[in-house]
């Protein structure tokens, strides 16, 4: 399934760890292209917000870029072998990056949006 990961700053009050995060990489969201349209999943408030964004033929990547977001187009992995590892659970971070990694099915180490961006562009 086609996916877009968008990286951005956070409007308003800001991120509690904002001073430690790279500019333009303070938050990330993911959008998935389904048969019926684009679905966006945002973990900004600590609870995944899911919303239908646009019809499937809409150029959502350009829309995000026009809004000032940095984007990476990728694919959601479907052939992931599930393996339970207690140690992984201990170092897993419940943030926007953790949610995007879980949805994409990627296992490499990244905690911040910028680390995720660098890994997606390798």
Tell me what each language-model feature is:
Residues 1-122:
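Cysteine-nucleophile amide-bond enzymes
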């Amino acid at each position: 399934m086609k996916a877009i990961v968008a990286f951005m700053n956070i409007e308003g009050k800001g991120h509690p760890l904002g001073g430690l995060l790279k500019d333009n990489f303070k938050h990330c969201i993911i959008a998935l292209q389904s048969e019926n349209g684009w679905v966006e999943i945002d973990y900004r408030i600590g609870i995944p917000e899911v919303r239908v964004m646009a019809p499937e033929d809409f150029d959502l990547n350009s829309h995000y870029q026009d809004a000032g977001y940095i984007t990476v187009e990728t694919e959601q992995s479907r052939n992931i072998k599930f393996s339970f590892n207690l140690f992984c659970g201990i170092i897993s971070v419940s943030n926007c990056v953790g949610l995007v990694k879980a949805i994409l099915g990627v296992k490499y180490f990244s905690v911040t949006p910028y680390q995720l961006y660098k890994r997606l562009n390798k």
